[in-house]
Amino acid sequence: MGKTTTSAAIAMGLAKRGHKTAVIDFDVGLRNLDLIMGCERRVVYDLVNVINNEATLNQALIRDKRCDQLFILPASQTRDKDALTTEGVGKILEELSKDFKYIVCDSPAGIERGATLAMYFADDAFVVTNPEVSSVRDSDRMLGILASKSRRAEKGEEPIKEYLLLTRYSPDRVKLGEMLSVEDVQEILSLHLLGVIPESKSVLNASNSGNPVILDEQSDAGQAYADIVARYLGENKPHRFIDEEKKGLFSKLFGSK
């Protein structure tokens, strides 16, 4: 369960609350956001087309059919990652900021061009990590880049606000010593915990059907993302899905949601 799942869920959550939101796929060459958002057949132009002046921003933006406050800007599957330029991305973000309350940048894993550009322009950063040593180590490396190579760092402005999102979390597996605990991850990364998303079959089901999991209000993962959006917007929501749940007969029979 990765960054694209989270970007789609948070963007949808913000839009469903009435905030005009754009979500941009920075993973040039792969392009998964449109699949998770269920709009892959509606892609005509993409991020690189706009940067290269082959299409306008309005031509490339896809309005979500479930929520009219949400727009998707897909990545290109065919272009090289070097097609992304600081100037080009900066212009797009500046234009979007005139009309949108929130712009969610879906950053690819690693430190390739798309990731570094998404981080460069960030005001807030959702650090999405799994409770595994390798994933947490990668996140720690990303935090170093956010602190030193962002536009805010270059200009000596207030640093990027960083929030920790812990995905695929299982209290049962933590108890067995198979994954890091919330406390372990927080101690390593020294970040404010925005939320924990439990390991859940509903995430895969949602992705396969082209629906952000936050729309599945009956699932644990959907509820967790809704809580995360609420906390980000300043609401006081108690953390859930961190402690081991005492299961009754019903939940033992039917498993996790």
Question: Where in the sequence are the language-model features?
Answer:
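Walker A/P-loop phosphate-binding motif and the immediately C-terminal alpha-helix
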Residues: 1-28, 96
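Short, well-ordered alpha-helices that flank and scaffold nucleotide-derived cofactor binding pockets
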Residues: 8, 12-16, 120, 144, ...
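P-loop/Walker-type NTP enzyme "switch/lid" segment
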Residues: 23-98, 207-209
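Conserved catalytic-core segment of NTP-binding enzymes
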Residues: 97-98, 102, 108-194, 205
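C-terminal lobe/tail of nucleotide-utilizing enzymes
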Residues: 153-257
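Soluble periplasmic/extracytoplasmic beta-strand elements of cell-envelope proteins
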Residues: 5, 72-74, 163-165
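Residue-level signature of catalytic and energy-coupling elements of molecular machines
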Residues: 4, 50, 73, 106, ...
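Amphipathic alpha-helical transducer elements in NTP-driven molecular machines
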Residues: 44, 58, 86, 90, ...
